[in-house]
């Protein structure tokens, strides 16, 4: 709604139009089985159906994909039940994001949201790109932390070459994920196409993610600062440039360092910590 943030009385709130509702981003950083996201899906879908009705009452045309479009497109069905199903699918695919450290919880969340969308004729897996596994409290939350290799970047340092290359990779991933986000899903072929787009975006970010992992690992292992960390980051700056330039041997070395750094103070039988880098996992949001 337009109004709550401005302190407007409830009776004067105005529902946002469909494009703005579909551009919302709702994230649960510890989603477990997805209960919060399921309720968010239901509530927002009801608001979207309401917004469609208001748009039509104002003389606009709503297409089958939920967009307010020109009148020559296929029309959205009029019955409320069908509209609710379409709205839930659109909200689930375009607006909901979730993270959990437990891989099983991630799969349960996918199943929970799939069930609430009533997408019984739709293949399972269409939320793979938005529901991810990792430690939402461990990782970078701003891209410049990675491009400057600093947890507190000033913005005044000249961007290194590897930093510019990382930014380029992120921009390419955003373009791919934007195509994925706008893609309608009707059958298994659409899901496969989405999976290919997501995999392509992940490949673009493979090296930046490895650099982010070792960066966070070294920060974690050093306790967050000190001369030891400074020396390690100087070394990482050189290795990051080599890895971005395609040196697979350096990249493999960095990945071995990651496991050691992210296993600091863990029992020997425990797997290494699993950072979650928000600007790389959800680049179109961050």
Q: What does each model-found stretch correspond to?
A:
Residues 1-25, 82-89, 115, 119, ...:
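Flexible, glycine/threonine-enriched loop-and-boundary segments that flank and lead into catalytic domains
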Residues 1-84, 105, 260, 272:
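Class I S-adenosyl-L-methionine
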Residues 2, 41-56, 101, 114-119, ...:
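Hydrophobic/aromatic-lined pockets within catalytic cores
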Residues 28, 97-99:
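Conserved SAM-binding motif I beta-strand of class I
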Residues 32, 94-96:
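Catalytic palm active-site di-aspartate
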Residues 38, 45, 101-172, 276-286:
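Signature of N6-adenine DNA methyltransferases within the class I
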Residues 91-92, 126:
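Short, solvent-exposed loop/turn segments at the edges of secondary structure
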Residues 139-280:
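Basic, amphipathic N-terminal segments
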